[in-house]
Amino acid sequence: CRLYPDFPWLYLQTDCRNAEFVPAPDWYYNFEYAREIERGYEGHEDLLTTGYFELPFRRGRSVVFSVSVEEIADPSTLGVMFAEALAARSLKVDFLSCLRHSARQFVVRRRDGRAEVLAGYPWYGQIGRQTLVALPGIALEQGRTEDCLDVLDTVVRERRDGMFTGSFSAAEAADAPLWFFWVLQRLQRTLGEEEIWKRYGTVMKELLAAYRRGVGGVAVHDNGLVWASAPDKALTWMNAVADGVPVVSRDGYPVEINALWYNAVC
């Protein structure tokens, strides 16, 4: 089924050969989500029900039902696919195992295959500072080095004039690119200094040069410290803005940003 022509097909499949799909299409137009509206998000969408499955069932029998934007060529293999997916999951038997399981859910893949970290469910997307602060914990400490590399490589590819873009840019968060160095220091324990320099040496030099050159309201002064100031943006972690004005103005040499700068250059 497909809601609209520009939407992907949605495949509803089961491993039960005797299952019969009963069409019973119906629309729910302009379904409203009050909380989304309260938070300033788009709060209406159309919902479609296409029908239901009827199948013979008996006690002790298992039936696997799949909902996906990708068609399963042989639905009879769904039982095996489900068992394999279940076996690959981490067991949730205590607080630590639940924490590890949850950590995996924050690294997601875009349609183009690139990886990113969601800042939180259900409201947030990718945020530069949160991504880099969290990455060692949700990836490296879980033994998921490839996830860490994939996220970093996504950030690195999307830089311009030596600086990261979007919420990873110093023009949006004065400290965000500096957390990149902090992540690399932890990644070095796994890959080694030579490999880190080979993969990211040019990027590190470009970032430091961009700070010295100045990006937005952020620049290194003659005294060697990072100055951050913008009339309409909160450039530190205290980033609340009301009516276009930062709630807490921290213009100057923020201590935590300069600590990260010192860490990056030394």
What positions do the PLM features span?
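Acidic, mature catalytic/reactive cores of soluble proteins
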Residues: 1-266
